[in-house]
Amino acid sequence: GSLQLLLLLLLLQCDKKGICSCAPLLTAMSSPRRIKEDLSSDEEGQVHPTLSPSEDHKIKISSLPFSVEALMADKRVPKEAPPSRAVDSSAATSTPNRHLHLGIRDSPSPLGSQKGLKPRRSNRKNSEDGTSWSKDGGSYSPPPRHLSPSSCTLRKHKTNRKPRTPFTTSQLLALERKFRQKQYLSIAERAEFSSSLNLTETQVKIWFQNRRAKAKRLQEAEIEKLKMAAKPILPPGFSIPFPINSPIQAASLYGSSYQFHRPVLPIPPMGLYATPVGYSMYHLSEEGDMT
């Protein structure tokens, strides 16, 4: 009887305070068999609180969504729940953002995949180039130069070209004497002169052509020398007020103590550089050897 009274008091307290606060006391006041069952259920990892039929009925009523207690609980919870909802909403907003960031990074879109794959391929190529460079020992071998085909070949001599005829000294002297006399030979003169020297007419003809070209070059060189000598050596602003050709004025340059007065010969201005426009035998013989 005393146990029933205690149970009733506990039920009243549970109605006032709530079922959850009185649940451990009810389990302690239950029979030892129930305690053993609770211990065995705790060991198995499943919690089944053993309550009286009235308490089970109240729990079932409270578990119904449209019961008075459930509605009262819903009214009380929203006042205390906003922070949790705010936390949940912040977590929910953060998770989509994370998913968005992850989606941007790991999106399987074809454009993203292509853009992401292209630099990787280039990196692979670079790495392969680097490995080949390291394998070669860091020595860069330039690509082999392809030799261009010899399209611009030099002009080849004719195979049927006649060999150069070496003239003797007597022949060269005779040719030089004849060239001084007459630079152009007629056909009859050339035939007679070539037979006298035991040469062909073509050999004599070619020698005279070469000798005329050489004489022209020498004459042009002499004219250039004369032009260079005609230019004044001294600058135009500098001039000597007295001529140095007279022996008296030349002696006055050296002073009165100069005893031996050598007569100074008059020197023409072109005499130092000018040479007679003629051909000596040495030049002619040398030119004949060259031809």
Swiss-Prot record:
InterPro entries assigned: HD (IPR001356), HD_metazoa (IPR020479), Homeobox_CS (IPR017970), Homeodomain-like_sf (IPR009057), Msh_Homeobox_Regulators (IPR050674)
Record region (Disordered): 36-58, 75-169
Composition bias type Basic residues, residue spans: 154-164
UniProt KW DNA-binding keyword: yes
CDD domains in the record: homeodomain
GO molecular function, one term: RNA polymerase II transcription regulatory region sequence-specific DNA binding
Annotated family: Belongs to the Msh homeobox family.
Record's protein name: Homeobox protein XHOX-7.1'
